[in-house]
Amino acid sequence: MELNAKPRKSQEKLAEGLIPAVAYNKDNNISFALDRKAFDRAFRQQSTTGLFDITVEGGETFPALVKTVQMDKRRRTPIHVDFYMVTYGEPIEVSVPVHTTGKSQGEIMGGLVDIVLHNLSIVAPGPRRIPQELTVDVSRLNIGDHITAGDVKLPEGCTLAVAADSVVISVLPPRMTADEAAAETQAAQVAGLVAAGELSEEAAAAVLEGDASIEEIKAEAHAAEGTQAEGSTEEGQQQ
């Protein structure tokens, strides 16, 4: 996509409707100004993976990718743009958005598809070979399954710039309700009391089935111990 720019000196006050921009690489640095509305429209179509051919009035035309866009927080409009100048035919590392397609088996069972890496770093063979997005089919994933960077199908000529075992997407188990979380906590507590010998298996079953609470079981056990102690005292006095 083409962008027309006006030359700009550092700290120069710009006319209404223009925003400052800079394009650079390891060997060059060019300052210029862009029409705010024209850039905003173009950027919405291209995003950070789209290639721009920038022509500076009275100067050269060069290819570049958007590096960063500074936005007006209140108006949500661009106020400054950094471009990275590239060279046709040379490999380039870029961060490409990851999108999913399909509905996973895990989702059908109540799970949640978690996109761990919303952008995947790859090396494209040249600026014109950069994909706008990477689409991943999640329809076969069950709860607990995941897709790594090595599983993602890349366009011909593109390679990963991250470890192949990096998790990109995973399917998480259903989120527990407050009641389910409380039940799980209680089960762990009961198991600990049984292991410590403070609760019998019969009493544990009663608690887990909702027939009694841990406090009630402990109170009954304490009362029984008190009754047993009183009986032992009476027997001693009779003797």
From Swiss-Prot:
UniProt keyword terms in alphabetical order: Ribonucleoprotein, Ribosomal protein, RNA-binding, rRNA-binding
NCBIfam families attached to this UniProt entry: bL25_bact_ctc (TIGR00731), PRK05618.3-3 (NF004137)
Cited Gene3D superfamilies: Ribosomal protein L25, beta domain, Ribosomal Protein L25, Chain P
Lineage top rank: taxon: Bacteria
Record-stated family: Belongs to the bacterial ribosomal protein bL25 family. CTC subfamily.
GO MF term list: 5S rRNA binding; structural constituent of ribosome
Function: This is one of the proteins that binds to the 5S RNA in the ribosome where it forms part of the central protuberance.
Self-association state and partner proteins as the record states: Part of the 50S ribosomal subunit; part of the 5S rRNA/L5/L18/L25 subcomplex. Contacts the 5S rRNA. Binds to the 5S rRNA independently of L5 and L18.
GO biological process: translation
InterPro entries the UniProt entry points to: Rbsml_bL25/Gln-tRNA_synth_N, Ribosomal_bL25/Gln-tRNA_synth, Ribosomal_bL25_b-dom, Ribosomal_bL25_C, Ribosomal_bL25_long, Ribosomal_L25_dom, Ribosomal_uL5_bac-type
PANTHER family (alphabetical): RIBOSOMAL PROTEIN L25/GLN-TRNA SYNTHETASE, ANTI-CODON-BINDING DOMAIN-CONTAINING PROTEIN, RIBOSOMAL PROTEIN L25_GLN-TRNA SYNTHETASE, ANTI-CODON-BINDING DOMAIN-CONTAINING PROTEIN
Listed Polar residues bias regions: 229-239
Region listing for Disordered, in residue ranges: 217-239
Gene that encodes it: rplY
Gene Ontology CC annotations of this record: cytosolic large ribosomal subunit
Natural source organism: Deinococcus deserti (strain DSM 17065 / CIP 109153 / LMG 22923 / VCD115)
Pfam families the record matches: Ribosomal_L25p, Ribosomal_TL5_C
Name of protein: Large ribosomal subunit protein bL25
